[in-house]
Amino acid sequence: MKQLTSAQIRQMWLDFWKSKGHAVEPSANLVPVNDPTLLWINSGVATLKKYFDGSVIPENPRITNSQKAIRTNDIENVGKTARHHTMFEMLGNFSVGDYFRDEAIEWGYELLTSPEWFDLPKDKLYMTYYPDDKDSYNRWIACGVEPSHLIPIEDNFWEIGAGPSGPDTEIFFDRGEEFDPDNIGIRLLEEDIENDRYIEIWNIVLSQFNADPAVPRSEYKELPNKNIDTGAGLERLAAVMQGAKTNFETDLFMPIIREIEKMSGKAYDPDGETLSFKVIADHIRSLAFAIGDGALPGNEGRGYVLRRLLRRAVMHGRRLGISDAFLYKLVPTVGQIMESYYPEVLEKRDFIEKIVKREEETFARTIDAGSSMLDELLANLKKSGKDTLEGKDIFKLYDTYGFPVELTEELAEDEGFKIDHEGFKAAMKEQQDRARASVVKGGSMGMQNETLANITEPSEFLYEAETAESRLSVIVADDARHDSVNSGQALLVFEQTPFYAEMGGQVADHGTISDAAGTTVARVVDVQRAPNGQALHTVEVEGELVVGANYKLEIDHSRRHRVMKNHTATHLLHAALHNIVGNHAVQAGSLNEQEFLRFDFTHFEAVTPEELRAIEEQVNEEIWKATPVTTIETDIDTAKSMGAMALFGEKYGKRVRVVSIGDYSVELCGGTHVANTAEIGMFKIIKEEGIGSGTRRILAVTSREAYLAYREEEDALKSIAATLKAPQLKEVPNKVASLQEQLHALQKENATLKEKAAAAAAGDVFKDVKEANGVRYIASQVEVSDAGALRTFADQWKQADYSDVLVLAAHIREKVNVLVASKSENVHAGNLIKVLAPIVSGRGGGKPDMAMAGGSDANSIQDLLSAVAEQF
């Protein structure tokens, strides 16, 4: 049997099938494109659906690939089994209506056993087949396989509901009796017993029938065009061909594990405890590839999967004694292992490292407290003799410390404890109920949830109206329903209303309510949604309001129009962010007020000034195109087929509103918008900032507020121009540049004077030479204005033979700066400063000849200087 690297196995696979007339299909992105049914690409055939369903006809009906894939349905098993991974490579060969069973089996056997190819021992190969599939049995016999190596298995039939289906034949490699401690032998295969002896290395699916759940399998009709779909795990083949005990001991994982050994100072022992090494090695592969393919850690969907993987790996790093961020340092190793076929990991190394490191640092800020709490909880359980971690405690870990529930469960189970899932769900629901209640109780509503929950009278929002005549159906005041009210504050429900209730980031309308005589009887100061969906108008009562009477409702037209401008501009901003920053920049929150708009979005670094300028310009270009804004109501499926952007976390009914701004922006939105982008007038970004892990915020203004913002900047510029005595604004940059040149010249002159002063002071410092164990050293506290002056001292010290070692300390702006320089081969400056720095509550490091450190305890400077002699 050949000893092949994983790269050689992959290439040999592709070369073999290419020699059989197959086209090599490149590995697709892990993030599915135009396939909402998949979270990740999870198999080799997943990217070829377009061929098998007939929507696209391949140029060549014979296809081969090596496809990266992610499956995360049972993450907790990673590291506990020999072959389970979250990311893996599936080698495949496919026939779309071309060759079938005979060629698939014959060529497969040739690839596995031919000396020219994999050269696996024939006596080590076993095949399972569907009992009624005599054709596959006979074909294996024709290839020379012994009947005793062909095992009929009833489950060897692939089908998922109605549609293409067929028998499959699986190929296993026998690793020998050492992996069969109970000497069960071939029954391991016959009875489908989980084992490490017979390893499945390949599955050939013969898509032959059209499955019909209404009839017995024996009555399935044959497909007019039969297909072949196969999958062989690269990791498993590598383990077999490299003689590895598990997949983790192959060249796909061991370089990563070796790096983890260096970081942890612990050795990986295949016969000992290896779980944490395996988990980290597996998860960093998934993280590196997924982030490289555009997925980012977050709180939902793919992002949550990545965040969960990262946090699980970090926790296992801590088990190995690694407390600092370390996963990002493994990214280059992952890239180097896979470079021959997947160069993109190294190409995107900086970006991937940045994302991983930032996530690690964010998690580290809460993990210590959470770990301590979990340890304490488990210790208390042991003392009390209980075996279940309570749901309220799991929720506190989740809510306060950011511990994923799955991670808490895993760590608890490792210690032999169960967790209370139902209790956790109850605690989560309580929090959600409190959050909903706080929205109802807060602001101007001031009512208990029970009162509002009992309102069942219907209320319709009139999108196109700004005034309406409507019947008053509910009055709530002082925590109770009333038939009438004539003063104070109240909540009103009308059968119909033009008032928009705050929702989707758009603030509520304000306005007035008048009686039949035209007298204003109430002013609307807020509108919120009641628990049953009605619009609750919070009003300041100025006259009598009576249930059952009709009133004229009129919104503040100016306020509504200003809010609409900002809301439509928000849609333009969202589209511009996609175009300029990337599709990962999706909405994480928004607020559309009358004075400004605020937009939160997912992104892992500050948007650059150049990007902000481009975004601003693009939004304004769309405004000045005077594009009509159209709104239609349709069903959710039609909306999605239009390409409408649905915001994650928003709940949509069967009917939705789609807001389109030409071809530039299409979003699902229940808010109100201008009829034409020209109404917005102008758009200006005021500020961009970070507000949390992976979330940025843009504050912007439109229309009159944008003009005022530009005028404010112009006024400030004119003031600067007057100060600089620049007759025209365009001369200000030159004037500022001239001032900067003068400043730099003065700074340079000042630095020269400092150097001279330091040189003069150095003369006294360098005279104070002491000796300890044959090492001449200078240890002194100096008065300097910055750390750079310490380096100046060191540079002068190097010019003459004053001593072997120089140690300087300075108290600069409430901090301690320490420098160590060495000319002695026996004294490493970096090592020496690591010993001295903690004395002043600091840390540092450096090279053998020069090292720096910072600290905070100025009172201990003399202790540090006194300790120098003890180090020689």
Curated annotation (Swiss-Prot):
Q: Which SUPFAM superfamilies match?
A: Class II aaRS and biotin synthetases, Putative anticodon-binding domain of alanyl-tRNA synthetase (AlaRS), ThrRS/AlaRS common domain, Translation proteins
GO BP annotation list: alanyl-tRNA aminoacylation
InterPro entries hit by this protein = aa-tRNA-synth_II/BPL/LPL, Ala-tRNA-lgiase_IIc, Ala-tRNA-ligase_IIc_anticod-bd, Ala-tRNA-synth_IIc_core, Ala-tRNA-synth_IIc_N, Ala-tRNA_ligase, Ala_tRNA_ligase_euk/bac, DHHA1_dom
Q: What is its EC number?
A: 6.1.1.7
Give the cofactors, semicolon-separated: Zn(2+)
- Highest taxon in the source lineage: Bacteria
Protein function:
Catalyzes the attachment of alanine to tRNA(Ala) in a two-step reaction: alanine is first activated by ATP to form Ala-AMP and then transferred to the acceptor end of tRNA(Ala). Also edits incorrectly charged Ser-tRNA(Ala) and Gly-tRNA(Ala) via its editing domain.
Domain notes from UniProt: Consists of three domains; the N-terminal catalytic domain, the editing domain and the C-terminal C-Ala domain. The editing domain removes incorrectly charged amino acids, while the C-Ala domain, along with tRNA(Ala), serves as a bridge to cooperatively bring together the editing and aminoacylation centers thus stimulating deacylation of misacylated tRNAs.
According to UniProt, the name of this protein is Alanine--tRNA ligase
Taxonomy of origin reads: Bacteria, Bacillati, Bacillota, Bacilli, Lactobacillales
